[in-house]
Amino acid sequence: MSDRNPLIDADRRADEDNTLRPQTLDDFVGQAAARANLKVFIEAAKVRGEALDHVLFVGPPGLGKTTLAQIMAKELGVNFRSTSGPVIAKAGDLAALLTNLEERDVLFIDEIHRLSPAVEEILYPAMEDFQLDLIIGEGPAARSVKIDLAKFTLVAATTRLGLLTTPLRDRFGIPVRLNFYTVEELEYIVRRGARIMQMGISSDGAREVARRSRGTPRIVGRLLRRVRDFALVAGADIIDRRIADEALSRLEVDNRGLDQLDRRYLNIIARNFGGGPVGIETIAAGLSEPRDAIEDIIEPYLIQQGFLQRTPRGRVLTAVAWQHLGLPAPAEIIQQSQYGLFMEDE
């Protein structure tokens, strides 16, 4: 047993969170195609001595959109400013941000789909012409003022590409879609995180944490810290598969990475609505969760793992979901599954 003090103070936890984040594109694990393209665009911008074109990251939460934005600023050697769509309440807030940017700085706006229409209108000329068009005064005394801005790079992130207006979406020269990570990529992240936290972990222990992390690095970091806590209290020098499994089971994360909320979602559709189809508003009411949270956080992983189908009539559970819940699937679901296997054989 190590003589390290398991009582870690808040400062160290904050440092640990920052250290777990990769600092360069070479350190960043996963998203190989996106990283390769970003390297080219960053290098080209540096050679030209110009600001990088505006970048839009699209994907579920926790896949590294903010981290990639920070890395891009570091690789470009410029300042990084960060905010989010809901924080920019009025045009003046955006104007204050933009006028404080220096040449080629990176401005990161998370949840850009939540910008108000008035703020979005101000953003168009800022992105395209690097100018602010502001109305000063009211009534007959009102006048239009143009303010020149430093040539900056806007890096934006969204989980809901469909909520972006076409004029805003078209102004991003570099759209980047991020996908869920493979178990192998997450396993590497787990081992790296364990080294940083000075905690031993076996190969099967790392894989157990990785495969139950919903394909998401942010969840990997959270689960690894909690598994580490269980291991320390148990007096273990190394996290093996048994310790990881016990810790994750106590955290109610099952062997497919589904947590309590995921299982409630599946059970509501299965037990209350016979497996669907059922509308999203009905599910949201049953879970007492907002629709956005369900569509952004719960459903993407369930769909990717084959538990759920979105149809014009509503959400429908697949045979995989019924099997995972340990419930008998309706006859039509079994028939569809058998028909799919038959078509594959053909």
Swiss-Prot record:
Q: What is this protein called?
A: Holliday junction branch migration complex subunit RuvB
A GO CC term attached to the entry? cytoplasm
- Positions binding DNA in this chain are 291, 310, 315
- Species this chain originates from: Brucella melitensis biotype 2 (strain ATCC 23457)
What reaction does this enzyme carry out catalytically?
ATP + H2O = ADP + phosphate + H(+)
- Give the encoding gene's name: ruvB
Q: Give GO terms for biological process.
A: DNA recombination; DNA repair
**Compartments in which it is found:** Cytoplasm
Q: Where does Mg(2+) bind?
A: 66
> From what superkingdom does this record's organism come?
Bacteria
